[in-house]
């Protein structure tokens, strides 16, 4: 035994250099060290596994796979080798192989606690709850620990609520009932030990809607002993479900006495008061209804009067009570006072805080438009700043800002004439500059300027004017103002978000990309806020620039997927049952994120559009994508909308904003766009697969000749193509019948239109439908092939003419307004080139295949002559010639597009710089450089786009010219 221990220590010392090199990222050195060690000890499994890891990190995937497979086949049992193999399989996302590893190891060592624990966690990663339960019970029998017992309990719970049988109510009931009995057995035996175990029991009871039992356990001695820190919200929830409103009311009064600024408690308290009103009146309690609300008012007033420092909570609660009483047609003014006076009082106390606007906005929908505007005027008077005066201090400035924001929310700016709006804009600029110079000195780089909201409001006003006049000059001026603010207040993300939005509206991808990078969006924000940029990149005119942004986003999702699995595993290791469902739901939301699925799909389309090498290299790139045309991998009914649409602050009129409807409409349209793009990619993939099928896993023949694709596989590819083609035309028919409306663009903060209407307007449907027929005819040699070649050729001409015509229109618009329709024009050009680029790649694949086939001479048998009535298939040689003719035609059309793009003029600003500088009224030394820099960004963005599009066309011309 001592000798064995000495050998283990010796091997660990020899493995140390490999581990050290892998840890610092020196993978090549790690590979050399592992090979050096294996020359001396060729049977050392851990060294072989480390070699496989080094190869994996060097990108030598096939060698790595072979090395790891050889080690796995030896069925190792030592912890070091198993850990290295597990790490490799996690990197490769082959989680089932980790399960197999530990299954073999456990068979050799059935009672090994550590191996069983690893096997359990491996089942956790693949969400096999039934297997989890079995292994957990094995563990408990081997080592009777509470943790293992409750692993089996939670596994039973998850079988009931998340497993494959969870949709069957009877099965769900059986599993949850079993889990409850398992815990109760432990309780009877006096083995319940921790607060997480108590939480799990409560959770099981609530899942079965046994709320009375849950309440009794929560308020019992055992729970008080094990779970003294049970969240109060758990009591709220149970009391509400059980209808114990009086008890809830008393509990909330106690809590509010202790913590007087809890707005969430106040809302629950007021709700309990109104629920008490609905209870049947008992004998001797005829004044109960009146008492309930008057007691509520007295309680709130008592908190206000007795508080040393003024806190928002009770004042907001009083407004909430007033609002609810009016909704129930109760005499609110008589009991509490005039609503306007309450709001003005709240404003006078708390308007020096930026949250005041949002607070007051909560209660505006409950009053009429006339009352809202009257209230807005009262608040402007209360701020103490008139049209002829400036704020005297920072607090007064914040009050004025709050009053202006509420005024806009009340609709005060909607009906103003344009000259009044322009005067208002000028006043806002003046207030911004005054506030910046007076109260914004010596700010830290991380602080926002106190007067920045004036500029944000000004940008919204200028958008209103631009929309009325259908001109870009006012909005361009707003963009320049925002860039000026950003120079003074580098951390104001509201300014960055609005600037990003305006750059996208004007089709300036370079400016948008700079703002997006300036926002420094990281981690989960790539999912919740990435939509502000990534969803606007497809068909923006810069395929490689878009691809880089997709890479950043997808890298987060890929890395976080592995991290999320480990977080879930850790919740089991530490028995944190209260967090398990939260982590599992979080994992599912990210896995099914619309942002992730869209970026992944558009990245694949970008790669196919941008292919520039020879046909065999391009086919290798295509093969790596692993597109399965017959399989729709998107879980459409589980797609998750994780966008944070409140990230961009807004003060638009409340009666004209329906945020929920806007979210739903945009999400529905984005899903339809995703369906179109996904189906287009799968349909296109069938074109390629029909002529270059995916590699067959069977070994190649001994004589070295290529193995031909079996006839059933060809028939399957053909039927898949026909099926997807029908789905393609059917989807377009359905979308036209759905008659989706473009997203409203009434305000600056509204989401930009989706690509749905653009994709319906452009000839995508006809182009790919006719292309599908051409591919089928080329494959079968149908007699109608020549006619379909002409039809496809006509489509190519139409797409080329669309591209040229759009560029000509853009140049004409430059004489009027070069920015207002710029984004739409760029999208049409990019879409045209996308279709032509995909067509060029397909023709190169067809030509390569047909050239090889046409050289193979087929000898006819003597009895194989057919009658003249039977149409003969077009010969391989003729098909090859037809494809080459299509390539020649495409080459000329691509050259025509290139010539048109050469003439595409950069956007011209609608007015000269001196006119803009006169309107900006900012510091003279700043104005020239500021507006010049913004103008240069537009020019550089156009030049980058033209260069990239021309390079794309040159690659495609080279591709079809070979």
From Swiss-Prot:
PANTHER family in the record: N-ALPHA-ACETYLTRANSFERASE 25, NATB AUXILIARY SUBUNIT (PTHR22767:SF3), N-TERMINAL ACETYLTRANSFERASE-RELATED (PTHR22767)
Start and stop residues of the TPR repeats: 45-78, 79-112, 523-560
SUPFAM superfamilies linked to this entry: TPR-like
GO cellular component: lysosome; NatB complex
Record text on subunit structure and interactions: Component of the N-terminal acetyltransferase B (NatB) complex.
Task performed by this protein: Non-catalytic subunit of the NatB complex which catalyzes acetylation of the N-terminal methionine residues of proteins beginning with Met-Asp or Met-Glu. Has 2 roles in the larval immune response: required both for the phagocytic degradation of internalized bacteria and for the induction of Defensin in the fat body. Within the phagocytic blood cells, has a role in detection of infection and activation of the humoral immune response.
Residue ranges, annotated region (Disordered): 856-880
Stated name of the protein: Phagocyte signaling-impaired protein
Pfam families: NatB_MDM20 (PF09797)
Similarity comment: Belongs to the MDM20/NAA25 family.
Annotated localization: Lysosome
Keyword vocabulary terms for this entry: Antimicrobial, Immunity, Innate immunity, Lysosome, Repeat, TPR repeat
Alphabetical GO biological process terms: immune response; innate immune response; phagocytosis, engulfment
Highest taxon in the source lineage: Eukaryota
Disulfide-bond pairs as recorded: none
């Amino acid at each position: 035994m001592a000798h064995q221990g000495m050998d283990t220590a010796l091997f660990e010392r020899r493995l140390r250099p490999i581990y050290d090199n892998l840890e610092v990222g020196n993978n090549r050195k790690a590979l050399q060290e592992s090979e050096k060690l294996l020359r001396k000890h060729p049977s050392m499994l851990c060294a072989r596994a480390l070699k496989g890891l080094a190869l994996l990190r060097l990108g030598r995937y096939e060698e790595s796979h072979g090395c790891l497979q050889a080690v796995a086949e030896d069925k190792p049992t030592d912890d070091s080798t198993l850990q290295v193999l597990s790490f490799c399989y996690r990197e490769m996302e082959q989680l089932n192989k980790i399960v197999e590893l530990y299954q073999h190891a456990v068979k050799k060592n059935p009672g090994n606690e550590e191996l069983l624990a690893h096997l359990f966690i491996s089942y956790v990663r693949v969400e096999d709850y039934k297997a989890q339960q079995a292994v957990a019970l094995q563990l408990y029998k081997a080592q009777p620990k509470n943790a293992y017992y409750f692993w089996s309990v939670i596994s039973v719970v998850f079988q009931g609520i998340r497993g494959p049988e969870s949709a069957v109510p009877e099965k769900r009931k059986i599993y949850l009932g079993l889990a409850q009995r398992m815990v109760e057995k432990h309780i009877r035996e006096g083995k319940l030990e921790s607060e997480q175990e108590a939480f799990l029991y409560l959770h099981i009871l609530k899942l079965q809607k046994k709320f009375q039992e849950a309440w009794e356990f929560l308020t019992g001695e055992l729970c008080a002993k094990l779970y003294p820190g049970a969240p109060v919200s758990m009591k709220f929830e149970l009391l509400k479900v059980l209808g114990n409103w009086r008890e809830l009311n008393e509990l909330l009064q106690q809590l509010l006495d202790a913590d007087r600024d809890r707005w969430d408690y106040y809302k629950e308290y007021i709700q309990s008061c109104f629920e008490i009103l609905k209870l049947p009146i008992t004998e001797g309690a005829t004044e109960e209804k009146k008492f309930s609300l008057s007691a509520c008012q007295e309680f709130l007033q008592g908190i206000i009067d007795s508080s040393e420092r003024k806190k928002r909570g009770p004042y907001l609660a009083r407004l909430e009570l007033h609002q609810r009483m009016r909704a129930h047609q109760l005499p609110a003014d008589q009991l509490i006072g005039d609503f306007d006076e309450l709001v003005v009082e709240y404003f006078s106390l708390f308007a020096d805080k930026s949250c005041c606007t949002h607070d007051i906005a909560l209660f505006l929908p409950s009053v009429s438009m006339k009352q809202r505007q009257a209230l807005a005027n009262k608040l402007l008077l209360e701020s103490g700043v008139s049209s002829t005066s400036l704020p005297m201090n920072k607090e007064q400035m914040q009050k004025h800002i709050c009053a202006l924001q509420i005024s806009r929310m009340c609709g005060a700016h909607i009906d103003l004439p344009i000259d009044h709006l322009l005067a208002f804009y000028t006043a806002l600029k003046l207030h911004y500059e005054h506030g910046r110079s007076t109260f914004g000195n010596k700010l830290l780089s991380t602080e926002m300027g106190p007067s920045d909201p004036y500029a944000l409001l000004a940008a919204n006003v200028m958008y209103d004017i631009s929309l009325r006049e259908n001109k870009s000059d006012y909005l361009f001026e707003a963009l320049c103002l925002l860039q000026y603010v950003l120079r003074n207040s580098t951390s104001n993300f509201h300014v960055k978000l609005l600037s990003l939005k305006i750059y996208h509206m004007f089709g300036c991808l370079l400016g948008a990309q700079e703002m997006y990078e300036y926002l420094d969006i990281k981690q989960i924000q790539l999912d919740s806020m990435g939509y502000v940029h990534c969803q606007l990149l497809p068909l923006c005119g810069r395929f490689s620039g878009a691809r880089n942004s997709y890479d950043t986003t997808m890298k987060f999702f890929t890395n976080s997927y592995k991290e999320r699995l480990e977080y879930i595993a850790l919740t089991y290791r530490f028995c944190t049952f209260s967090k398990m469902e939260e982590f599992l739901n979080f994992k599912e939301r990210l896995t099914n994120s619309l942002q992730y699925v869209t970026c992944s799909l558009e990245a694949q389309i970008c790669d196919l559009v941008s292919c520039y090498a020879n046909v065999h290299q391009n086919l290798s790139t295509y093969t790596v994508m692993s597109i399965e045309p017959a399989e729709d991998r998107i879980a459409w009914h589980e797609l998750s909308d994780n966008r944070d649409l409140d990230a961009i602050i807004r003060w638009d009129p409340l009666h004209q904003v329906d945020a929920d409807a806007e979210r739903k409409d945009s999400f529905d349209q984005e899903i339809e766009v995703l369906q179109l793009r996904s189906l287009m990619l799968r349909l296109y993939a069938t074109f390629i697969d029909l002529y270059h099928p995916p590699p067959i896993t069977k070994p190649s023949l001994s004589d070295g000749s290529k193995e031909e694709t079996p006839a059933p596989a060809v028939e399957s590819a053909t039927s898949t193509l026909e099926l997807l083609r029908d789905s393609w035309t059917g989807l377009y028919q359905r979308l036209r019948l759905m008659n989706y409306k473009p997203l409203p663009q009434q305000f600056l903060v509204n989401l930009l239109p989706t690509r749905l209407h653009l994709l319906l307007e452009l000839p995508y449907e006809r182009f790919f439908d006719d292309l599908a027929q051409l591919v089928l005819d080329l494959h079968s040699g149908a007699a109608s092939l020549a006619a379909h070649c002409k039809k496809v050729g006509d489509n190519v001409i139409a797409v080329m003419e669309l591209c040229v015509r759009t560029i000509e229109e853009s140049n004409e618009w430059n004489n009027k307004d070069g920015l207002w329709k710029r984004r739409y024009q760029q999208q049409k050009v990019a879409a045209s080139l996308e279709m032509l680029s995909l067509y060029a790649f397909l023709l190169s694949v067809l030509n390569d295949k047909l050239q090889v086939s046409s050289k193979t001479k087929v000898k006819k048998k003597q009895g194989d002559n057919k009658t003249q009535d039977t149409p003969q298939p077009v010969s391989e040689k003729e098909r090859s010639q037809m494809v080459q003719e299509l390539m020649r035609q495409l080459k000329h059309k691509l050259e025509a597009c290139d010539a048109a793009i050469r003439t595409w003029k950069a956007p011209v600003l609608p007015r000269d710089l001196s006119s803009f500088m006169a309107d900006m009224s900012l510091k003279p030394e700043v104005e020239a450089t500021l507006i010049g820099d913004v103008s240069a960004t537009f020019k550089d963005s156009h030049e980058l786009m033209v260069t990239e599009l021309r390079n794309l066309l040159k690659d495609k011309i080279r591709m079809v010219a070979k």
